[in-house]
Amino acid sequence: MAYGSVGLTTAGGALIVLFYLIMALTSLTREETRLAIERMAELHVPVPALVFWIGLALQFGGIALLLTGWHADVGVCLLIFATVTASAIFHRFWTMQDAFRRAVSRRMLLHNMAIVGGLLLLLQYVR
């Protein structure tokens, strides 16, 4: 399979990094931090505050490695791990009774699957 130019790959990688940067910075707001930790506690995640901060550290670490190009492949893997883990925690749509919440959660899981797909494509270029 032939892939696009280096410019397209760079643009795609930049959009992925921008997405994660915006999400991570948003998670640092007091309200978002509180909501995420409370939701994890409701979902019976052990030590939810610690899990939250580890997840955020993985995101910022992955972003930094991609931006600097130093072990960028490890950075992509950190973002994949963080995304899959967050999806497993927050988007268990099959357990939800409310039809609207179930539909939204299913879509979010599918969005995250697509993002992981983009990260896997990016991984081949940063190795």
Locate each region found by the language model.
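Extended, low-polarity transmembrane helix blocks
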Residues: 1-35, 46-61, 67-127
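Short amphipathic alpha-helical coupling elements at transmembrane boundaries
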Residues: 38-42
